[in-house]
């Protein structure tokens, strides 16, 4: 399994989608897993247009509960279900996330075939996802909101001193 980390912007638009831009959604591919940060309307369609599979999402982090940051979640979860997902899904957000996801999962008539766990985060709470940790940071907005700091854990690798010199990295004690 690859340890590569890749970020894919699925939506960067404002409060509502436009013909050329989707609303907030960013996928972070870490090895074979995908973390989703916000899930605005149309996120599942943006996944289909990208090279990233929404079936590989292991965790979703919602920054706040304005529609342009979470209204894509019900459709995404139902599409995962219809596509045969069995792997668990973790969803994190600010206080109120448990009630919101419970209400979301009651929409429509379908039986969820995979487990969904929900966690509410406060400032400085940390979620350990194996290769990375995600730390919540309280944001300033008109509603309670979080930003997220993603940190990759140290891993063994190969250092190429000649390439470092070419890039202008000054020699030092860890060179």
Task: Give the residues covered by each predicted segment.
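Metal-dependent phosphodiesterase/nuclease catalytic metal-binding core
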Residues: 2, 121-175
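Conserved beta-strand hairpin/beta-sheet module of binuclear metal-dependent hydrolase folds
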Residues: 2-52, 88, 148-150, 156-157
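Generic structural signal for residues in well-ordered beta-strands
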Residues: 7, 116-118, 134
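Short glycine/serine/proline-enriched coil/turn segments at secondary-structure junctions
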Residues: 16-18, 110, 141-143
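Active-site metal-binding motif and surrounding structural segment of the metallo-beta-lactamase
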Residues: 41-92, 120
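Alpha-helix N-cap/helix-start and coil->helix boundary motif
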Residues: 44, 54, 67, 97-98, ...
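Structured loop/turn residues at beta-strand edges in well-structured enzyme cores
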Residues: 52-55, 114, 130-132
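Active-site neighborhood of divalent metal-dependent phosphoester bond hydrolases
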Residues: 85-120
